[in-house]
Amino acid sequence: MKGLILVGGYGTRLRPLTLTVPKPLVEFGNRPMILHQIEALANAGVTDIVLAVNYRPEVMVETLKKYEKEYGVNITFSVETEPLGTAGPLKLAEDVLKKDNSPFFVLNSDVICEYPFKELADFHKAHGGKGTIVATKVDEPSKYGVIVHDIATPNLIDRFVEKPKEFVGNRINAGLYILNPEVIDLIEMKPTSIEKETFPILVEEKQLYSFDLEGFWMDVGQPKDFLSGTVLYLNSLAKRQPKKLATGANIVGNALIDPTAKISSTAKIGPDVVIGPNVTIGDGVRITRSVVLCNSTIKNHSLVKSTIVGWNSTVGQWCRLEGVTVLGDDVEVKDEIYINGGKVLPHKSISDNVPKEAIIM
């Protein structure tokens, strides 16, 4: 089987982290985000994976090629000279995706969930249509494009309603699909939207179905959702692979901690915390609902809450970081500083408080 991951472009919503590496290489749960997807595809029997890239492809190639052997897959990079939207990349990768005439998976690189690829493939083959969208249920469907089903045929999609003012359903497109190769014939080699241009044709032909996703789902393409997705991911690990989570007298709730991290016995970590390789946590530090990326240091008696601490950064003593603060690569926060919702660009030194949301350049 084959799969295409829409890696996309600049990752502006996740800046300042994406000023240093492309978004799919930002570590989520201590692994590059895209590795969660590559591993799930490989586990479902996918042997050919296409990464549709239009930003810094050379970095992606250098980082990901080494994983081919580990996961037993062929990784091809389909490089767009101009952004082609969500459908154009399928046309660009037509040679790989049409190989052996079997269905192929498509997924957005921002999506984190318990990828149900095997079940999705079985469901797709059983209904015999040309395409299947994975759907997830949401509490506030008025914020999204909602899937409405055909009354007579379960799971057959009748139409999409964009941001409905009245309740028509609570299932939305989760950004994971399986499609038959002939769907590529509906796509032109130009910037095209699969959601707005390709799927409506399949709906008209009564060839598009939806598959309900079980478990958690999150688009982690911006800091607030990255942190929310981390909470959901750790909850999922606690159920499926609890041995991966840290335990100890100073651990509260779910925490994923790299074994090379050095943490003071008087620090308190958790709930909902990820700590990367070679991180140092000082005495009396308190960290909740946060991610600390590799080679960073949190000095004594600081509070880190709802924050992403970027690589190689230092947080001084008696600091308080909260409110979805994001430190870029190699940031230094001086002692006794308060940051509330600051987005700090790489290589900055912060010696003044940031009491409200701001971009520090």
Curated annotation (Swiss-Prot):
Pathway given for this chain reads: Nucleotide-sugar biosynthesis; GDP-alpha-D-mannose biosynthesis; GDP-alpha-D-mannose from alpha-D-mannose 1-phosphate (GTP route): step 1/1
Question: What is the reaction catalyzed?
Answer: alpha-D-mannose 1-phosphate + GTP + H(+) = GDP-alpha-D-mannose + diphosphate
- Molecular function GO terms recorded: GTP binding; mannose-1-phosphate guanylyltransferase (GTP) activity
Enzyme category, top tier: transferase
The family database entries (SUPFAM superfamilies) matched by this protein are listed as: Nucleotide-diphospho-sugar transferases
Protein keywords: Cell cycle, Cytoplasm, GTP-binding, Isopeptide bond, Nucleotide-binding, Phosphoprotein, Transferase, Ubl conjugation
Where are the Phosphothreonine residues found in this chain?
Answer: 153
Biological process GO annotation list?
Answer: cell wall mannoprotein biosynthetic process; GDP-mannose biosynthetic process; protein glycosylation
Which Gene Ontology cellular component annotation is one that this UniProt entry carries? cytoplasm
Q: Gene3D superfamilies, per this entry?
A: Hexapeptide repeat proteins (2.160.10.10), Spore Coat Polysaccharide Biosynthesis Protein SpsA, Chain A (3.90.550.10)
Under InterPro entries, the record lists: GMPPB_C, GMPPB_N, Hexapep_transf_CS, Mannose-1P_guanyltransferase, NTP_transferase_dom, Nucleotide-diphossugar_trans
The EC number of this protein is 2.7.7.13
Placement of covalent cross-link Glycyl lysine isopeptide (Lys-Gly) (interchain with G-Cter in ubiquitin): 244
Subcellular location as annotated: Cytoplasm
Extra remark: Present with 97100 molecules/cell in log phase SD medium.
Tell me, in a sentence or two, what this protein's role is.
Involved in cell wall synthesis where it is required for glycosylation. Involved in cell cycle progression through cell-size checkpoint.
**Similarity section:** Belongs to the transferase hexapeptide repeat family.
Protein name as catalogued: Mannose-1-phosphate guanyltransferase
**Source organism (scientific name):** Saccharomyces cerevisiae (strain ATCC 204508 / S288c)
